[in-house]
């Protein structure tokens, strides 16, 4: 069991600005590189943020990876356009910056490294030599910011089409369609686009056949039922055996992070539901918690429990779809229809509480949209009485089936080392024997007050183990819901804080000052203090996080969304090489991903 991250900060509110100079890793870095080798930034991220020189990057990364309790996972990597940022007191001069978020499982601690870059020299050495999963993150950072990673094995666009001009997350790049010239698809442009789609193996890092060997190249997707969305995998086959494969993503990209720079802190909430469109309120949780850190808001206990309750309902809802579609991918049709019957009961309950079903957009900065309705407890009790028996029937009728076991046991198997190298989280990581669930390791929204267990595998993560862990996670979510039902606190559903949005009625319409405040907050949105905040949660598919940068405005200066599905799809080639195409179908079904979560 990992140590609880809250030990060092148990007496401090989550939103306190800290430089984390007391974190042991800061001392280790200073002992190795000298006390003046870098700048420590005070933030509300909850992790040490260290600015280092570009020339030090690989040496510092290697040092952190080889510490006695090493930082073994590259959790996230991306960039920021710093040119319009006004609140940068005490930070190195930078037109752009790149950040590297590393996690140590043994310490249950993080560190964020930052590198400052000048606009006329947007080069930084590739991190893929230390962490293979840096590949996609560096491609995306180049695609959206134009930052070059020297030595990268295949630095090409990943979100945008190969013919795209410009880098969309730069501040001088238009954010609205009305800022572009009208689009016209001329014959010449159409021919250019078609030419760009011509498949050339060497552009994908694959080798062509020779006189002595020949391969078949096969497209799986982007329209294939087992691809679970607009997702393409280019397969290099020797007969039925997968010699190599390259996932091709970006078909579902909607510019969610760019939208965060146009919407107010409050009006961005509905967008979070649609990042991973099966998770509902689960996706709202990291965003509102990160904004509340910026605002300095501590919510009432009732809000915490309500948020946990809605999150676990959506976790069950998502897991039911995952388990049933996995069974369908293996070849059994009936369970998916049973699952949709059970999911309908959850949607009815969610609708009774929030007024909406799939995308409630119900969490608010400082609380929730409204209080629980009368009768919510009866509906939840009926569901809790119904679901355990149904779950047992899924397991007995389908998941213990010998054909399903034969198709999934030992398929696409990997160990803890591989999972950490590729940034795998959620059931895929825990199946390898690593007990890391954010709800336990780094409790948020009051999860530390609930009694539940974290299912963990025996050392190897294969398709069958991943699915069975999700089944047990369903049971644990039912335990949490039972406690929500029996121990729902009394109290307000919003925090009494000036930045709670929309503000409580008692803070509005009393006299001219409250009228003005209400008008500004509702029309323009609240003004968040200039700072940075970060929040990770245990989402339905793994760890989801929001890293927010405020420049003291009504909108976010930078909204970075790290999703689990993105990391999990990058791992596909490493896990499936040498297997059969039929094994790939089972593997895809066991990952639990949706393309909106990948492409954002």
Curated annotation (Swiss-Prot):
It is found in: Cell inner membrane. Residues 214-600 are annotated as: NADH dehydrogenase I subunit D. Its EC number is 7.1.1.-. This is NADH-quinone oxidoreductase subunit C/D. HAMAP family: NDH1_NuoC, NDH1_NuoCD_1, NDH1_NuoD. It is a peripheral membrane protein. It catalyses: a quinone + NADH + 5 H(+)(in) = a quinol + NAD(+) + 4 H(+)(out). PANTHER family: NADH-QUINONE OXIDOREDUCTASE SUBUNIT C_D (PTHR11993:SF45), NADH-UBIQUINONE OXIDOREDUCTASE 49 KDA SUBUNIT (PTHR11993). GO terms for cellular component: NADH dehydrogenase complex; plasma membrane. Residues 1-190 are annotated as: NADH dehydrogenase I subunit C. NDH-1 shuttles electrons from NADH, via FMN and iron-sulfur (Fe-S) centers, to quinones in the respiratory chain. The immediate electron acceptor for the enzyme in this species is believed to be ubiquinone. Couples the redox reaction to proton translocation (for every two electrons transferred, four hydrogen ions are translocated across the cytoplasmic membrane), and thus conserves the redox energy in a proton gradient. Keywords: Cell inner membrane, Cell membrane, Membrane, Multifunctional enzyme, NAD, Quinone, Translocase, Transport, Ubiquinone. NDH-1 is composed of 13 different subunits. Subunits NuoB, CD, E, F, and G constitute the peripheral sector of the complex. NCBIfam families: NuoC_fam, NuoD, PRK06075.1, PRK11742.1. In the N-terminal section; belongs to the complex I 30 kDa subunit family. SUPFAM superfamilies: HydB/Nqo4-like, Nqo5-like. One of its GO terms (molecular function) is quinone binding. InterPro entries: NADH_DH_suC, NADH_DH_suCD, NADH_Q_OxRdtase_suD, NADH_quin_OxRdtase_su_C/D-like, NADH_UbQ_OxRdtase_30kDa_su, NADH_UbQ_OxRdtase_49kDa_CS, NADH_UbQ_OxRdtase_CS, NDH1_su_D/H.
């Amino acid at each position: 069991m990992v140590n609880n991250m809250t030990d060092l900060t148990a007496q401090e509110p989550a939103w306190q600005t800290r430089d984390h100079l007391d974190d042991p890793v800061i001392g280790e870095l200073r002992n190795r590189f000298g006390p003046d080798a870098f700048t420590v930034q005070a933030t509300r991220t909850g992790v040490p943020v260290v600015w280092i020189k570009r020339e030090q990057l690989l040496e510092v990364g290697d040092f952190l990876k080889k510490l006695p309790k090493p930082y073994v996972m590259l959790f996230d990597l991306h960039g920021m356009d710093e040119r319009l940022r006004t609140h940068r007191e005490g930070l190195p001069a930078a037109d752009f910056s790149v950040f590297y978020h590393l996690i140590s499982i043994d310490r249950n601690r993080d560190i964020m490294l930052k590198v400052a870059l000048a606009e006329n020299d947007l080069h930084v050495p590739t991190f893929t030599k230390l962490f293979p999963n840096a590949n996609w993150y560096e491609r995306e950072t180049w695609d959206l910011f134009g930052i070059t990673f020297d030595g990268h094995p295949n630095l090409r666009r990943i979100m945008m089409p190969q013919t795209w001009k410009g880098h969309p997350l730069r501040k001088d790049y238009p954010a609205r369609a009305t800022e572009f010239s009208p689009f016209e698809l001329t014959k010449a442009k159409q021919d250019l686009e078609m030419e760009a789609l011509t498949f050339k193996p060497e552009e994908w890092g694959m080798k062509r056949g020779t006189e002595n060997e020949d391969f078949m190249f096969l497209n799986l997707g982007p329209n294939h039922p087992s691809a679970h969305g607009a997702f393409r995998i280019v397969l290099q086959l020797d007969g039925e055996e997968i010699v190599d494969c390259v996932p091709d993503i970006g078909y579902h990209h909607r510019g969610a992070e760019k939208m965060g720079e146009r919407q107010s802190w409050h009006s961005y909430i509905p967008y979070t539901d649609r990042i991973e469109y099966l998770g509902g309120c689960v996706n709202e949780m990291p965003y509102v918690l990160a904004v509340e850190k910026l605002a300095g808001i501590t919510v009432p206990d009732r809000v915490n429990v309500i948020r946990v309750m809605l999150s676990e309902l959506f976790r069950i809802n998502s897991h039911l779809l995952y388990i049933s579609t996995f069974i369908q991918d293996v070849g059994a049709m009936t369970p998916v229809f049973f699952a949709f019957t059970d999911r309908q009961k959850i949607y009815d309950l969610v609708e009774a509480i929030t007024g909406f079903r799939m995308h409630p957009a119900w969490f608010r900065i400082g609380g929730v949209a409204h209080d629980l309705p009368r009768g919510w407890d009866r509906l939840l009790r009926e569901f809790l009485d119904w679901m355990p028996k149904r779950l047992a029937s899924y397991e007995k009728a389908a998941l213990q089936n010998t054909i399903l076991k034969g198709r999934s046991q030992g398929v696409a198997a990997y160990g803890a080392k591989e999972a950490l190298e590729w940034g795998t989280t959620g059931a895929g990581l825990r199946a390898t024997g690593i007990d890391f669930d954010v709800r336990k390791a780094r409790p948020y929204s009051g999860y530390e007050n609930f009694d539940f267990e974290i299912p963990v595998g025996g050392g190897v993560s294969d398709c069958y183990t991943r699915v069975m862990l999700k089944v047990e996670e369903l049971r644990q979510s039912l335990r949490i819901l039972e406690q929500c039902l029996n121990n729902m606190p009394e109290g307000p559903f919003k925090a009494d804080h000036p930045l709670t949005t929309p503000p409580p009625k008692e803070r509005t319409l009393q006299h001219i000052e409250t009228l003005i405040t209400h008008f500004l907050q509702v029309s323009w949105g609240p003004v968040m203090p200039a700072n940075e905040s970060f929040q990770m949660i245990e989402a339905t598919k793994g760890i989801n996080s929001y890293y927010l940068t405020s420049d003291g405005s009504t909108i976010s200066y930078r909204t970075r969304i790290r999703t689990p599905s993105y990391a999990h799809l990058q791992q596909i080639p490493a896990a499936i090489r040498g297997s059969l195409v039929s094994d790939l179908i089972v593997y895809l079904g066991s990952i639990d991903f949706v393309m909106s979560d990948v492409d954002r």
